Amino acid sequence: MTLTTINLFNNAKDFIIIPAGEVIFEKGGIADYMYVIIEGEVEILIDGKFLDITSDGGIIGEMALIDSSPRSATAIAKTECKLVPVDQKRFEFLVQQTPNFSINVMKIMVERIRKLDALVVSLR
């Protein structure tokens, strides 16, 4: 995400601190929130297998929030993390009122799809 988008959340009062090693959400869980990572690193795992690390300025949990599906992966704090939870109502407000936010979410999702495409090709 760009600095402008990070600044949308930097002064948020509703941040949460997650200690290193704590599960943020689990695969199959209900998606009430996506999270903006203000500080820290989060590991993304599927069935115990490492998929990715997301850090400062990244987002996690957006897919399940967008399509109301169960979580597709587990997220674990690799380091202590400062996260801002974003529920459906807040997400929709940000999408409508802050086009830059929407574009950055799309860019992140496209980047993840490209990584997965490359992985699929490498497995053939």
What are these regions (language model features)?
Residues 1-124:
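Cytosolic regulatory regions built on CNB/CRP/Popeye-like sensor folds
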